[in-house]
Amino acid sequence: MINMDVIIHKIHQLTPSIRAFELISANGSDLPAFDAGSHIDVHLKNGLTRQYSLSNCCSEQHRYVIGVLHDENSRGGSRCIHQDYREGDHLNIGTPRNLFEIHSKTQKAVLFAGGIGITPILSMAYRLKHQQIPFELHYFVRSHEMIAFYGNLTEHFPEQIHFHIQNQSETQCEMSKVLEEVAPDRHLYVCGPAGFMQFVMDSAQQAGWSDEQLHQEHFVAPQIDQSQNEAFTIEVLGSDRKIEVSAHQTATQALLEHGFDVPVSCEQGICGTCITRVVSGTPDHRDVFMTDEEHALNDQFTPCCSRAKSKILVIDLA
């Protein structure tokens, strides 16, 4: 993946805890094109790499806009970019990748965003409007002051945007009404906290929507009980090395400690950067990147979070 040097051109305080960072090329050239739903890897000065969705219209090549929530429970990514970066500072980023594309057969769309989940959804709204595809956007927030990109939403999508504010009965969403029209060319896109997304997905499935019509973007992997973790052994194809992975470490950590180079990014099983081929053994899949069908093949796994059901896992790092 190609990395680029960009400059933080502007910083906007969207809400008390969300800032938008407008990024431009350091050499003045256009930035690589992207599609709605794309994200970029941001390599931070504290050594962490984090993924942030692009929120601006994909027809713009002079800038990228990312929205970053300052999470008090952050592992260091959002805290670093909020506290340690100012306008004019340089950032190293990767080229855009898209794991949350608008389905090619979408003729009508329903967009759901919860909190910071508006970031990829906003870019989708721009794209759908440009393509003249009918859509509605339902944005759920805890309070009015927590609405990110309020000006953009009300200016560009006055007929499509619906704000749903917690504990305000007049803004509550009637899910059954929103989801009552079930048609093969109608697709649903959702991004936000895990519980919110599960609620939307469950509601749609109960209303008769098929899995092929439902699309979601994870920012944080669902919590997994680690108390039952067991140690296992990794054998690296082409070497005589046997790497012991303790119950309290990830496969990636064990491999790096023993000198093996494993690309990592999100460290949560979201981005797919670390996917590694499995030669033999059975992985214990804990990622949200691969599909159930891909998991069933057991021919690859994400060492940043997944483990092994078998005692030994033989992998290919070539």
Curated annotation (Swiss-Prot):
<feature type="domain" description="2Fe-2S ferredoxin-type">
    <location>
        <begin position="232"/>
        <end position="318"/>
    </location>
</feature>
<dbReference type="GO" id="GO:0046274">
    <property type="term" value="P:lignin catabolic process"/>
</dbReference>
<keyword id="KW-0813">Transport</keyword>
<feature type="binding site">
    <location>
        <position position="274"/>
    </location>
    <ligand>
        <name>[2Fe-2S] cluster</name>
    </ligand>
</feature>
<keyword id="KW-0058">Aromatic hydrocarbons catabolism</keyword>
<comment type="subunit">
    <text>This demethylase system consists of two proteins: an oxygenase and an oxygenase reductase.</text>
</comment>
<dbReference type="InterPro" id="IPR017938">
    <property type="entry name" value="Riboflavin_synthase-like_b-brl"/>
</dbReference>
<feature type="binding site">
    <location>
        <begin position="1"/>
        <end position="97"/>
    </location>
    <ligand>
        <name>FMN</name>
    </ligand>
</feature>
<keyword id="KW-0001">2Fe-2S</keyword>
<feature type="binding site">
    <location>
        <position position="304"/>
    </location>
    <ligand>
        <name>[2Fe-2S] cluster</name>
    </ligand>
</feature>
<dbReference type="Pfam" id="PF22290">
    <property type="entry name" value="DmmA-like_N"/>
</dbReference>
<dbReference type="Pfam" id="PF00111">
    <property type="entry name" value="Fer2"/>
</dbReference>
<protein>
    <recommendedName>
        <fullName>Vanillate O-demethylase oxidoreductase</fullName>
        <ecNumber>1.14.13.-</ecNumber>
    </recommendedName>
</protein>
<comment type="pathway">
    <text>Xenobiotic degradation; vanillyl-alcohol degradation.</text>
</comment>
<dbReference type="InterPro" id="IPR054582">
    <property type="entry name" value="DmmA-like_N"/>
</dbReference>
<dbReference type="GO" id="GO:0051537">
    <property type="term" value="F:2 iron, 2 sulfur cluster binding"/>
</dbReference>
<keyword id="KW-0479">Metal-binding</keyword>
<feature type="binding site">
    <location>
        <position position="266"/>
    </location>
    <ligand>
        <name>[2Fe-2S] cluster</name>
    </ligand>
</feature>
<feature type="binding site">
    <location>
        <begin position="107"/>
        <end position="220"/>
    </location>
    <ligand>
        <name>NAD(+)</name>
    </ligand>
</feature>
<dbReference type="InterPro" id="IPR017927">
    <property type="entry name" value="FAD-bd_FR_type"/>
</dbReference>
<dbReference type="InterPro" id="IPR006058">
    <property type="entry name" value="2Fe2S_fd_BS"/>
</dbReference>
<dbReference type="GO" id="GO:0046872">
    <property type="term" value="F:metal ion binding"/>
</dbReference>
<dbReference type="InterPro" id="IPR001041">
    <property type="entry name" value="2Fe-2S_ferredoxin-type"/>
</dbReference>
<dbReference type="InterPro" id="IPR012675">
    <property type="entry name" value="Beta-grasp_dom_sf"/>
</dbReference>
<feature type="binding site">
    <location>
        <position position="271"/>
    </location>
    <ligand>
        <name>[2Fe-2S] cluster</name>
    </ligand>
</feature>
<dbReference type="GO" id="GO:0016491">
    <property type="term" value="F:oxidoreductase activity"/>
</dbReference>
<keyword id="KW-0520">NAD</keyword>
<keyword id="KW-0249">Electron transport</keyword>
<comment type="similarity">
    <text>Belongs to the PDR/VanB family.</text>
</comment>
<keyword id="KW-0439">Lignin degradation</keyword>
<dbReference type="InterPro" id="IPR039261">
    <property type="entry name" value="FNR_nucleotide-bd"/>
</dbReference>
<dbReference type="InterPro" id="IPR036010">
    <property type="entry name" value="2Fe-2S_ferredoxin-like_sf"/>
</dbReference>
<feature type="domain" description="FAD-binding FR-type">
    <location>
        <begin position="1"/>
        <end position="103"/>
    </location>
</feature>
<keyword id="KW-0411">Iron-sulfur</keyword>
<keyword id="KW-0408">Iron</keyword>
<keyword id="KW-0288">FMN</keyword>
<dbReference type="InterPro" id="IPR050415">
    <property type="entry name" value="MRET"/>
</dbReference>
<keyword id="KW-0285">Flavoprotein</keyword>
<keyword id="KW-0560">Oxidoreductase</keyword>
